[in-house]
Regions:
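Conserved PLP cofactor-binding pocket of PLP-dependent enzymes
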Residues: 192-213
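Alpha-helical scaffold segments in soluble metabolic enzymes
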Residues: 58-65, 93, 142-146, 174, ...
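Alpha-helix/helix-capping structural signal
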Residues: 85, 138, 202-205
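Aromatic-enriched alpha-helical interface/lid elements that frame and gate functional surfaces
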Residues: 116-194, 198, 243
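Short secondary-structure transition/capping segments
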Residues: 16-17, 164-168, 210-214
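Flexible, small-/acidic-enriched active-site or ligand-binding loops
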Residues: 159, 223-244
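Active-site-adjacent "lid/gating" segments in soluble enzymes
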Residues: 1-135
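Short, surface-exposed loop/helix-turn segments at secondary-structure junctions
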Residues: 97-105, 210-224
Length: 244
């Protein structure tokens, strides 16, 4: 028999009897400490990395145990703790701690030392009217052309990744001068067509009505005999020979 169990802190160790919820797992797994802005408190992400992340780790463990049973003929218990799962998802920050020898600080939406790699305001300035843009070295010149700043191509202040880090405030400012005049999906379309990785910050309503997600069957409208019509998230895993 292969069987699985999930606990907040597992069945062994000093915290094994402690109760846990999603935010508790994020706090104890290190996720909260690296989420949010530098001058604000540690922040919970409501992407459910503790709940859903633990479940996905558990499924992987079950599949591994089933594969092993095929060769050994023996079953076993699969155990995943919520704290362990969050720690695994925070492994990049743990790596950075080893690299720099100190706790990783909250950095808002800035992605590491990439510049640009941040959120930029868009028209008309609503709570979620932002687009996230990241451009590595080979994307820098196309980005400048798109935002109508070809005059900066070759400018030594921004020519290398290291130089852009030193002038990050200036870079972010002239990118936002362009994005703030455009709706987030318009900005995303223009940038994406130029090969610049980007994404509009979509609220839940926009996600539910996203034409791409609907085309892929990720957002589905269902009819229930007693509840009526409602919308759900579909299956993110696509199998070529199975309709799941």
């Amino acid at each position: 028999i292969v069987y699985a169990s999930i606990k907040g802190f597992g069945s062994s160790g000093p915290y094994s009897a402690f109760k846990s919820f999603e935010p508790v797992a994020q706090a104890m797994g290190g996720s909260m400490s690296v989420t949010g802005f530098p001058d604000n408190p540690p922040t919970v992400t409501w992407s459910c990395v503790g709940d859903s992340g633990t479940g996905m780790h558990c499924v992987i463990g079950i599949l591994a145990a089933l594969m092993q049973r095929n060769t050994s003929g023996e079953g076993q218990q699969v155990e995943v703790s919520m704290q362990d799962a969050v720690v695994n998802l925070v492994r990049v920050s743990l790596r950075d701690h080893q690299r720099y020898g100190k706790p990783v600080e909250r950095n808002g939406n800035q992605l590491g030392s990439f510049v640009p790699a941040n959120t930029y305001r868009c028209h008309p300035g609503g709570a979620n009217d932002y687009v996230f843009i990241i451009a590595q070295q080979q994307m820098w010149e196309p980005l400048l052309r798109v935002i109508e700043r070809a005059d900066l191509i070759g400018d030594v202040r921004y020519q290398t990744a290291e130089a852009r880090v030193e002038h990050a405030d200036e870079v972010n400012a002239f990118i936002e001068e362009w994005t703030v005049k455009r709706a987030k999906h318009e900005a995303m379309q223009i940038l994406a067509e130029a090969g610049v990785p980007c994404g509009a910050c979509q609220d839940t309503s926009e996600v539910l009505n996203d034409p791409h997600l609907r085309a892929r069957g990720m957002i589905l409208d269902l009819d229930h005999p007693t509840r009526g019509s409602y919308t759900i998230a579909g299956n993110p895993i696509k199998l070529s020979a199975s309709n799941v």
